[in-house]
Amino acid sequence: MQVPQDGEDLAGQPWYHGLLSRQKAEALLQQNGDFLVRASGSRGGNPVISCRWRGSALHFEVFRVALRPRPGRPTALFQLEDEQFPSIPALVHSYMTGRRPLSQATGAVVSRPVTWQGPLRRSFSEDTLMDGPARIEPLRARKWSNSQPADLAHMGRSREDPAGMEASTMPISALPRTSSDPVLLKAPAPLGTVADSLRASDGQLQAKAPTKPPRTPSFELPDASERPPTYCELVPRVPSVQGTSPSQSCPEPEAPWWEAEEDEEEENRCFTRPQAEISFCPHDAPSCLLGPQNRPLEPQVLHTLRGLFLEHHPGSTALHLLLVDCQATGLLGVTRDQRGNMGVSSGLELLTLPHGHHLRLELLERHQTLALAGALAVLGCSGPLEERAAALRGLVELALALRPGAAGDLPGLAAVMGALLMPQVSRLEHTWRQLRRSHTEAALAFEQELKPLMRALDEGAGPCDPGEVALPHVAPMVRLLEGEEVAGPLDESCERLLRTLHGARHMVRDAPKFRKVAAQRLRGFRPNPELREALTTGFVRRLLWGSRGAGAPRAERFEKFQRVLGVLSQRLEPDR
């Protein structure tokens, strides 16, 4: 395949399908490795790579980075994750021939292009219409009518020219005008353009007379305030989704909220007093697994959850947990109104401030609730010993998938390790012995890697650099700011206190880096709605204590459930 150095012949590529809806694209993808490139109507015409990988259809938006116009270099670069390319064909060629994954999160590899078999020009009526006024079809040349005169700008240009199709960069003298169109702006045309236009018109004599031109203008220039500037710096621009009515909105958008870039802060934004109650965890969200009223530990729901977790490998579950933790912490998906209400740009900064008290309590409850649910996954196995050992192995593998260098979700890792180190679980000698006998690698990883790592994180000495970590360990700092005393001898507790405060300061400083790393981890990831809900704080709270008990005081709820876990542990392995 010829690799062009610019994006002018994208429409000529066999794998480019023009404007194509998500559903029709998925219908064309039959086998693993099949892929095509399409223009997404819901993403403002931006190119999207659709592929099938491991039985699932995945969609990756190609981001455009505008460059300052200079002779001899492209006007834009295109990228999926980190590496940038001068054109979309060059990007596709690199990923296809090199067998490189489109994203590290999914590992999807494209190998077989799905060729477009239809005519070159496709109309909007064939696929999904864009929301809003009619627009020029992206990345396809406009089909000019017979009544429009030939021009060098159109005769010499190939059938696809993104730069030429934009009104902001198209010369006004090159715009076609019928006899009834009003003159928008008179500008002297270069001599070469006039001469070439005269030569081009010699070959444009039609056999029949052209149709009568319309009485209304065929093309209108937008106001100067609406046109984007032709001068631009090297700034990634992610177009925003056009607003749609509720009846037209799609339940699964092309670009989820965790992939959208944060809005730029206004320079002269007026100061607003931060609100005392900031929450990123919706408490009244509708549930697809629980009814409006439910009792604690419903057997049918527990059976459904068991099958749900068995269907997903630990790496996928870790990404689901990272997504929910980033939302609960306020690292991703924070709106401009929320930033204005809390006075800072992310929840990591809010945790260190006095008015972050409510968020700190929410994260403490989330940590303890997930730890109790993990312990229940082991203690609720009333079958043979091997079943409980398999549950332990599943938690250990999930912890390994959450550790730094993998998903990098340290709050999720702390919750899973809290379940494994809970006294009601750690006392099960026969179960742990069976784990060492049947799943030796998991047992060694728990003893030699996970336990020392968790000890270092709790003492403020573990890894916390962005890149290795997507979401830092906030529990020690949250407990400290909520007034909990640091355990241990006085000299050791003072050193631990200083390390915790030092780590909190670095966490706030590196909050934008953590946000970028988390977004890269989740780019291209499409979660299972049920598994994602099963990892939210509100769902786990209702699962453990029921719809009525979920509103009881936190200390009372945890004390009662600890006793329930103690009874289950004694039933499995009574004291000698």
UniProtKB/Swiss-Prot annotation:
Pfam families: SH2
Modified residue annotations for Phosphoserine: 123, 125, 147, 180, 201
Residue ranges annotated for the SH2 domain, each copy included: 15-114
Record CDD domains: SH2_BCAR3 (cd10337)
Keyword Membrane: no
Phenotypic consequence of residue 95 to F: Loss of phosphorylation
GO annotation terms (biological process): JNK cascade; small GTPase-mediated signal transduction
Transmembrane segments: none
Subunit structure: Interacts with BCAR1.
Function: May play a role in JNK activation.
Protein name, per record: SH2 domain-containing protein 3A
Gene: SH2D3A
